[in-house]
Amino acid sequence: MKMNNKKVKPSDSAGIVFKIFLLFLSSVLFWLSNPNIFFEDGLGCLAFLNYLPILFLIKKSRFIEAVFFGAVYGGLSYGLYGYWLNAFHPLGLIIVCIGYFVICALLFSVLKWADIITSKNGWLLQFIIICGYEYLKTLGFFGMNYGVTAYTQWKNLYLIQICSLGGVFALNYIVIFPSVFLFSLISKKKEKYRLLNNVDNGKKSSISAYVKKEKALSDTSLKLTFICGGLWLAIFAASYIYGLSVMGKNNSDRYVTVAAIQNNESPWKNGIEEYSRNVNKLIQLTEEAQSLSSEIDFVVWPETAVAPSIIYNYDYGTDMRRFLLISQLLNFIDENNAVFVIGNSHEEELKNTGRTRYNSALVFESGKNVHPPEPGIYSKIKLVPFTESFPWKHTFPYFYQKLLNGDIHMWEKGDVYKVFDYRGLKFSTPICFEDTFSTVCRRMVLNGSRCFINLSNDSWSKSNACQKQHLAMAVFRSVENGVPSVRSTASGVTCVINPNGKVIKAAPEFCEAYIIGRVPVIDDGQQTLYTRIGDIAGIVAAGLSALILIIQTIVVIITKYENRFYR
């Protein structure tokens, strides 16, 4: 039996080390460009280079290596980015890391395939693929917007105004392009030097050398690279000019005053004593806010701020302590002049299925729908995968039971994008991470909403980075649709956002607090281009990349077959 004593060349070892360096660099760039434990607002400027090391890594790797590196990149990047999921449950972080282990392995394989089947300008196809990937990863049951590159620019108010025209995925084109431009510029210059050096050192006739030199110059031409770079520069400048023009505009001459309450309570504490203490705290904070301003039109409490179902315990409840707590709350609301928007674990009694639970927002107005409680109700439609919803509980009962053992709350899904109309303000109430989805909020605006009142509870994360990541996405919902947002959260970030995405008031995180802010009343006729056309920028990128990949693959197969046939 022969032993393989083949030694690893120093150049091979250096190549492996460099690939690992590129892998870690790309993960760190992704992590630091978003809100993180070191920079709570994120270093958004780094996002313009996020994909540069990835493209070089793919270029230098064989296909199977690219798949492996993609898997490691996905798990590592989202492990760093979403470390706070471990505070909820280690299984949550594991699921996300495994999910992106698979997703990024597929992404890298497609990017490598694009590199293989294109001879000159594969970087341009890779650019479209990346933009398409960032849209596709937000779709479906597992889809989420966390980690979309353009969200890193949430503090860059002038630049993000372009989202009112094409949404966050249009901005993605602008932020991602510098990575592929620099990759093309550097790699083509290196390749040009290598090819010309080979021609000069080769023992060829002058005619053969001339032909090879011309081919080398053609294959490494930077003409298209510079044309695309110039076009990007023009679009970037135009986006800033557009941002400057719209930032100074006054959106409305009518306002309502809103008090958003932050109770700083943990979602893990249960029991009637805890519920009573929390409701009393919310009432106290509300009274403090109202003592500072007699003009408050709306009071907003966070997601599931009132844990016992208000309507169920009033109409059907058998627990006297819960009934008394609900009665105390309703009496307080009925004696108050403000409209109350309250997060509640709403329950309904159904004949066939028994009691059904929803994560809901209830809207009360004194003298109209408080006694008996008949509030306007919106129930969360986009539920968090695995922690609020698991559609395959009958297919995978063991795994479903494991999830339930993790002390999570499974909710029924709502079915109506409700728009409330109180005191001249038409608003919708996206709950928790619903305001991270452009499709959800756009649907609400199309239904007539002119303000988002978001109820959230991210206190379980014990992380400022988590709450800033959430806020960053909420900012874009206002810009895309040209409407203000009010966020009432358990621990942060409770704030008021104007239609241009500027956070005009915010409460400190992880403390009991409230903010009082004026919210513009937007006219019904005002609707942004994005609201009308939706995420067409993402759809085009996904569709175009798939089409080009298919066509180019067919061309390569036919060419290879013809070369064999005529050989």
Locations of the language-model features?
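Membrane-embedded alpha-helical bundles of multi-pass enzymes
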Residues: 2-246, 463, 474, 489, ...
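Short, conserved active-site loops that position catalytic residues or coordinate cofactors/metal ions
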Residues: 38-53, 262-263, 295-315, 449, ...
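Active-site catalytic loop in hydrolytic enzyme cores
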Residues: 85-91, 136-168, 354-438
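Short, solvent-exposed loop/turn segments at secondary-structure junctions
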Residues: 87, 308-309, 349-350, 460-463
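CN hydrolase (nitrilase-like) catalytic-core segments centered on the catalytic cysteine
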Residues: 127-128, 306, 318-341, 395, ...
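Soluble catalytic regions of membrane-associated enzymes that act on cell-envelope
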Residues: 242-385, 420-423, 429, 433
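C-terminal luminal/periplasmic domains and tails of membrane-associated envelope-modifying transferases
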Residues: 294-295, 389, 484
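Short beta-strand scaffold segments in enzyme catalytic cores
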Residues: 359-363, 418, 492-497, 515-517
